[in-house]
């Protein structure tokens, strides 16, 4: 484990991820047996299995073709990516389940920050302030882009299903075993839940 080699500056929003499919999905039961493309991640694959579907790790640039050729039944991503990659053309059903939100961390090397401080003691504070300011701007712009993409997709004719509170609770209960499978990260998971 490397300690104190990176300094956190801020986090950018990479959007909330939801499922989109070739056929309409409205409930957890509807996911049973479907093949869904997920990011290359053991945790994401475990989540898909716990939801009753089959995970498929398809290279992102091939997702459109895989959907078009019925190699997969669906995928998951955020609104802007769904729109930009044209996945709505071959998977026009969007299940707004919001199962993941992935932050993009802005980091700096501790050694670089120390070298900057040697040049001018104000530089590390300036870098941190810029990180914070850029994150606030990025998150505002991302929210606008996300809303714009969702609006455009709805206008295009994508059928959106938003989970009820009860159905969302069923999704949460189904993936509870994922937390146990990644117990070594349990303290971090607990801190995120409490935030």
Predicted regions and their residues:
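Active-site loops and adjacent core secondary-structure elements that bind or stabilize anionic groups
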Residues: 1
């Amino acid at each position: 484990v490397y300690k104190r080699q990176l300094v956190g500056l801020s986090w950018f929003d990479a959007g909330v991820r939801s499922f989109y499919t070739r056929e309409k999905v409205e409930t957890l039961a509807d996911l049973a047996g479907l093949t869904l493309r997920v990011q290359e991640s053991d945790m994401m694959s475990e989540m898909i299995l716990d939801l009753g579907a089959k995970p498929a790790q398809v290279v992102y640039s091939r997702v459109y073709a895989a959907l078009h050729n019925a190699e997969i039944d669906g995928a998951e991503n955020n609104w802007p990516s769904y729109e930009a990659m044209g996945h709505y053309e071959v998977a026009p059903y969007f299940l707004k389940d919001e199962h993941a939100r992935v932050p993009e961390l802005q980091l700096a090397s501790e050694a670089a920050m120390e070298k900057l401080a040697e040049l001018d003691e104000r530089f590390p504070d300036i870098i941190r302030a810029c990180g914070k300011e850029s994150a606030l701007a990025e998150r505002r712009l991302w929210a606008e882009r996300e809303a714009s993409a969702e609006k455009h997709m709805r206008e295009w004719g994508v059928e959106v299903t938003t989970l009820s509170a009860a159905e969302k609770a069923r999704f949460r209960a189904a993936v509870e075993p994922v937390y146990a499978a990644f117990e070594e990260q349990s303290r971090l998971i607990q801190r995120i839940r409490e935030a």
